[in-house]
Amino acid sequence: MKDMNRNIYSLLAISLFSIVAMCSCTALDEAPDNRTEIDTADKVSKLLTSAYPLSSPALLCELSSDNLVDDNVVVPATHNSPYAIFHEQAYKWEDIDNYSTGEDDTPYTVWESYYQGIAVANHAIDAMRQMSEDPANDPELAHSWGEAHVLRGYLHFVLVNVFAEAYKDETRSLSDNGIAYVREVENTVNVNYGDPKYRKSVAEVYDLIERDILEGIDLIDDSKYQVPAYHFNRNAANAFAARFYLFKRDYEQALKYANNALGANPQLRNWKAINQNTLEMKVNDYNDEKLACNYLIQSTYSRQWRMHVSSARFVINEGGKFTDWNGKEWHIPSTLDVTCFGSGPNWSGVLPAYSGMVYVNGAGQEYGAWLFRLYEYFEYTDKIAGIGYVHQIYQPFTADETILCRAEAKLYLGDRDGAIKDLELWTGSHGVEDPLTLDKIKTKYNRAKVNNDWVSELYPAEMGFEKVLTGDDLSVLDCILHFRRVETVHEGQRWFDIKRYGIKVIHHYRGANEDEIHTDSLTWNDPRRVLQIPQNVVDAGYPSTERTRPVKLQDGSSIKVPGVYQPKGNNKK
């Protein structure tokens, strides 16, 4: 942990910036401290260390997705309040109240942290331009030039997938509002980032991300890093490119970059090597920066673990049935079964890799479960007083997730057998000894089975997919999406899969002081799939996101209902 702390807790260049009101787009308008000059390759490299964000959208994405249930619904005797008010707002897909720097995991902290990283990357790029006429071909600067561009592309990639629609196609995504793509150092305040000069369509943002990836990816040199896992090393950069092209549906390129990351002999996680003695040992072994499977490690300020153990309101839990006020019976899928404690096509019971790795809330198993890697690190600022900061370690890119990206790309390229082979490599690395076959996949992901929690309603045609999978290929896709859900639980990736495939999500919820259960659904075209721009950013002039949805009336006309409206089909009549 010593190396990790040195690399991810020391913000080597944060004193370079005095954060000015970003119209209040805070981080977008950061100006350099005139007392500091970035005039050497070493200074540029150290500056880029501070460009990696200390926040993650994982908690917001998990709450928005179908990975969590409201325990007040599945355990009727409970009347739990959320750990934080905005957790309930996120679960109900409402606009989230404005929070500033005092609260972790909010839209504001994600927006601020990622745009701050973009500002740092831009300052590094600008400094290199002043140091060399051709930084990309300067042996002292080329590596940092590559890292800065790939990192800038990645930060915009996260922001556009959180605060904008999923990519559909080159035509339809031109009409979807994206985000501000910032490529310049701003030396003035009150810049209007809602101006088309900055705020681009989703399609334009993707084009600019691709430009940054291609500008930088071949220049990255792992030998320049002391600890590569905390930077965009070559494997991490190629894994990012694979995911980017998968989301853009350029499957040839997705396959190419996944192969670059994985190599001829993919080194997936060795779960048997994880020390089982204590929870802390498990987490330390999982996050070991020396493991070949850990492509990129990110430390954040987050209270996601505490949401699971201190509130037991929005949790991973078993499902069940209930009848609403209108007499309609609802089936609530078991999020426990489909994430960290359920069967698969070639294993029964719990996935072997997760055996002994799933923990329950101290109040009892009925109050939810969580996977060991969610456990937080605590950084003491005063050990005697017992105060400090909570950190969550995330791994944005791993070999295990990348091989699932490759399987999906292979499937769309017509190589179903190759996709199944990759899926079998994944199950094998997770301790499954039985072979994976198409017949087993078809049996597990049988869409004709009533209430099959392992399959989801997909709307690929509506989301712009040129190729819509059917039959056996669709079963393999269901398997891939299930494995992705298992692999990335707690990390928010399920939300992005929901967005890109138009997966329908149903949330049932009951307030702490309520007896009535509310039900709401999120269809493929519901604008609430886009998180609202933070209110303080909107107040400063950045346009808010339209999150209203048309509702058909009996006469065939329609009205717009605010996105915060919750349809209550279970009201008394």
Regions found by a protein language model. Give the residues of each.
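Hydrophobic-face positions in mid-chain alpha helices that act as interaction patches
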Residues: 255-400, 433-467, 487, 493, ...
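Conserved, well-structured interaction surfaces
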Residues: 86-164, 196, 200-204, 213-225, ...
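Membrane-proximal, proline-rich intrinsically disordered regions
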Residues: 25-75, 324-331, 502-573
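Bacterial Sec-dependent N-terminal signal peptides
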Residues: 2-7, 18-47, 51, 209, ...
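Aromatic-residue-lined binding/catalytic grooves and analogous aromatic/hydrophobic interfacial grooves
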Residues: 25, 234-272, 559, 564-566, ...
